Amino acid sequence: MNQIELMRTLIAPVVSEKSTAGAEKNRQFVFRVKPAASKLQIKSAVELMFGVKVDSVRILNVKGKSKRFGRFMGQRSDWKKAYVKLKPGFDIELAVN
């Protein structure tokens, strides 16, 4: 897989109270990734984009919620989330404003 496709694997970091606590304590970061991405692709993308060494990757599929759109019920899209743990001595600085 070339570098451009790897860079498109990661969509965005997931910023929440749980993900921020994991980043501070365990060097564990959470990303929203493409639904077809594998663990190896996610690991390669993080190492390429941030210049760090990845210890482990855990992925899960998040089911979309049912939401009301006016008088109709709709469904949000399903998406994939990846928990990436870094090796000791490495860190990612995510600027959150």
Swiss-Prot record:
The keyword Aminoacyl-tRNA synthetase does not apply. One of its GO terms (cellular component) is ribosome. The keyword rRNA-binding applies. GO terms for biological process: translation. PANTHER family: 60S RIBOSOMAL PROTEIN L23A (PTHR11620). Part of the 50S ribosomal subunit. Contacts protein L29, and trigger factor when it is bound to the ribosome. Belongs to the universal ribosomal protein uL23 family. This is Large ribosomal subunit protein uL23. It comes from Methylococcus capsulatus (strain ATCC 33009 / NCIMB 11132 / Bath). The lineage of its organism: Bacteria, Pseudomonadati, Pseudomonadota, Gammaproteobacteria, Methylococcales.
